[in-house]
Each structure stands twice: as structure tokens, then as C-alpha cells.
């Protein structure tokens, strides 16, 4: 029988608490700690007041390729990559620190959760590590962005340099959407009358 280390268990509980606080799903907790599923569910209920959400983890790389998600994913992954290269941290600790940096840059806006959830950020790291995704440089701005693996060199233009038409529409409506929406409705009423 293998004896469990009390110190390791305490570290795992602390890590699980931090991950749960940041919004990690149960599958991520099971993968990153040595705690049993039952203990993780108990801990999750204690911290969140409800059982962990059920369902599969995101498994498609396509989510990271759409324009807005790509910008957020790239911002997170560049922070993660910097932390690894600088030797400040590794593994799940680097994911947590990079995610906290991402949250600082994309603060919670009136109850709307951040576009990139912690579990999705963790999945992104796994996709890059497995060679399904990579960082590629933009031909226009020189920034590095998440792309499908084996993206041909010098062929990528990011969605900041070349935004899709729907991005421009969203930007026009976003500054004061309540005010703009009422103005648009007023214009439509004037045209109809």
C-alpha cells in the first residue's frame, strides 16, 4: 500500500481551491491534482455552493480560430509562453499566472464572464503542446497569434490587422450599446413615419 504524503495532499487541496476559484472544470482538477474525484466534488461544492458542471471538455481547435476568441487566446498564450521562457514557473502554475494576467487585461464587465475560461485556456496549452495548434507571426503587425499547426510561413494576417466585417459592426455598437440601440430605433421610427 502506498502511503500518501500529507504535505502533497495539502498542496493539491490548495491548488484545487485556486483552480476552482478561477473556474476550472472537474476534468482539469482531476488531471492536475492527485485528489480523488469524490474529494474534488466535495471541495467544489464547498467553495462554489453547487456541484461541478457536467459534460465534456472542449475538444475542437476551431473555437480558437474565430476572430475574437483568437485574440483572447493569443493574449493568454503569449503570457504563458513568456512565463515559461523566463523560467518563472512551469506547468499548471504557469497556466494560473498567465490566466490571472489575462484577467487583468480583460476585466469582468457587468457580470459578463471573460471570453476565455480557465479550462479552455488549459485546453489551449494542451493543444499547442500536442502540435495541433501553434503560434504564428502576423505579416502586418509582427504579433504572434494562435493558428492551426503547420501554418505556412509568411501567410498569416491576424484579425486585428484584417478584422472580419462582423467585427466592425460589433465595434460600432459596443461603446454605449444602450444609447446607440435607442438611437438606431429612433432612426428606424423616423424612416418608417
Swiss-Prot record:
Pfam families: FlhC. It is found in: Cytoplasm. Keywords: Activator, Bacterial flagellum biogenesis, Cytoplasm, DNA-binding, Metal-binding, Transcription, Transcription regulation, Zinc. It comes from the Bacteria. GO terms for biological process: bacterial-type flagellum organization; positive regulation of DNA-templated transcription; regulation of bacterial-type flagellum assembly. Zn(2+) binds at residues 138, 141, 158, 161. Its cofactor is Zn(2+). One of its GO terms (cellular component) is cytoplasm. Binds 1 zinc ion per subunit. One of its GO terms (molecular function) is zinc ion binding. Heterohexamer composed of two FlhC and four FlhD subunits. Each FlhC binds a FlhD dimer, forming a heterotrimer, and a hexamer assembles by dimerization of two heterotrimers. Functions in complex with FlhD as a master transcriptional regulator that regulates transcription of several flagellar and non-flagellar operons by binding to their promoter region. Activates expression of class 2 flagellar genes, including fliA, which is a flagellum-specific sigma factor that turns on the class 3 genes. Also regulates genes whose products function in a variety of physiological pathways. Belongs to the FlhC family. This is Flagellar transcriptional regulator FlhC. The lineage of its organism: Bacteria, Pseudomonadati, Pseudomonadota, Gammaproteobacteria, Enterobacterales. The gene is flhC.
